Amino acid sequence: MTTGKTAPRRLSIFGSTGSIGRNTLNVVEHLGGRDNFEISVLTGNGNVELLARQAKASGARLAVTASDRHYDSLKSALSGSGIAVASGKSGLMEAADCEADWVMAAIVGTAGLAPTLAAARRGADIALANKECLVSAGDLFLKSIREGGGRLLPVDSEHNAIFQVLEENQRHAVERVVLTASGGPFRTASLKEMADVTVETARAHPNWSMGLKISIDSASMFNKALEMIEARHLFGLTPDQIEVILHPQSIIHSMVGYTDGSVLAQLGAPDMRTAIGYALSFPRRPNLPIERLDFARLARLDFEAPDEVRFPALRLARLAMTRGGVQGAVLNGAKEVALEAFIAGRLSFLAMADITERVMDDLAHLPPAAEMDDVFSADSQARQRASQLMKLDLVG
């Protein structure tokens, strides 16, 4: 006689030690933990101690550090646990091959591309938090999803909001999508004030708790620029259908406008667990301990148009979408080098966009990507050119 109890759902979390990964494990625990879920793989990078703790607590089958030099430390930390250990690029590909019904793709940067594409081709549902999959390799990634037969579930709060309110049978009637942005710590800063921005002031996001790089990307609005490109691929939009509005309270996460004048919006407290929980439970809605909105206390919601002189990243996103091809990969690669230079104190805050635009112009001749090697080549060329420009002191 059967009990009727369903088998635990198999999950893999790529990037479990980051903010998205930690919140994913938190959601899993709130939704029943090991009673309802089986963790196949956890991957991290240098935070071996946290990765080992997570693997033991969740009962993961495999723990992977993306850095080969941390393999011995992870192996030692998990000695006697029965949890397999792997490292480096080969370890990440091993993680992608492990059986899992649902994969959280939260590895930051191009390092997340290959394992996420491999998991997609295998047919897993992909909860996508890695931006490079769509920004750098959108067409190829979507092809992998189609060929594998799994679902693509956006985890970025803005895209998840659109996903929640986009009526599948009314896609033909979509007129526009509106991505909201808090404006970050420099929403009201002057151009002169932004010229003197430091890493510490740039990382202080008013609403969201995030890692260093994504906090600075949010401050420069490069994060929103990447989200614009992602939205185009995710929802089959033209560049003209994508708008950005500043909304400092971060309560409305995005809106969809229809041809009859209706606008549907998703509202909620700024908590990543909402989007993660929806992606994990889709098409059902989970019961999560998220702060409920008190509209009487909230009282008001503010909006304003973004200033693309102070935040040129938005203009660069439209330029990349208009040019097409590998310009998304070029934008992202150049931006990454400029961001690292800013963090290291070698480049000013405003010069990040200048460097990125110069590289985009210099590499505008590159052909569209026919395979992933073309994407990696465009990314590599963009990074090399950005480094060259900074060495020549052409900007900043």
Curated annotation (Swiss-Prot):
**Per the entry, which co-factors are needed?**
Mg(2+); Mn(2+)
Q: Which UniProt keywords apply?
A: Isoprene biosynthesis, Manganese, Metal-binding, NADP, Oxidoreductase
Using the chain's own numbering, where are the disulfide bonds? none
- Which InterPro entries does the annotation name? DXP_reductoisomerase, DXP_reductoisomerase_C, DXP_reductoisomerase_N, DXPR_C, DXPR_C_sf, NAD(P)-bd_dom_sf
Query: Which positions are annotated as binding 1-deoxy-D-xylulose 5-phosphate?
Result: K131, S157, E158, S182, H205, S218, N223, K224, E227
Q: Which Pfam families match?
A: DXP_redisom_C, DXP_reductoisom, DXPR_C
GO molecular-function terms, A-Z: 1-deoxy-D-xylulose-5-phosphate reductoisomerase activity; manganese ion binding; NADPH binding
EC number(s) reported in the record? 1.1.1.267
Q: In which pathway does it act?
A: Isoprenoid biosynthesis; isopentenyl diphosphate biosynthesis via DXP pathway; isopentenyl diphosphate from 1-deoxy-D-xylulose 5-phosphate: step 1/6
- Where does this protein hold NADPH? T17, G18, S19, I20, N47, N130, E132, G211
Output the Gene3D superfamilies linked to this UniProt entry.
1.10.1740.10, NAD(P)-binding Rossmann-like Domain
Q: What GO terms in the biological process aspect are recorded for it?
A: isopentenyl diphosphate biosynthetic process, methylerythritol 4-phosphate pathway involved in terpenoid biosynthetic process
Which reactions are catalysed by this chain? 2-C-methyl-D-erythritol 4-phosphate + NADP(+) = 1-deoxy-D-xylulose 5-phosphate + NADPH + H(+)
Where, in this chain's numbering, is Mn(2+) bound?
D156, E158, E227
Q: What does this protein do?
A: Catalyzes the NADPH-dependent rearrangement and reduction of 1-deoxy-D-xylulose-5-phosphate (DXP) to 2-C-methyl-D-erythritol 4-phosphate (MEP).
Family, per entry: Belongs to the DXR family.
Q: What is this protein called?
A: 1-deoxy-D-xylulose 5-phosphate reductoisomerase
Organism, scientific name: Rhizobium etli (strain CIAT 652)
Identify the coding gene.
dxr
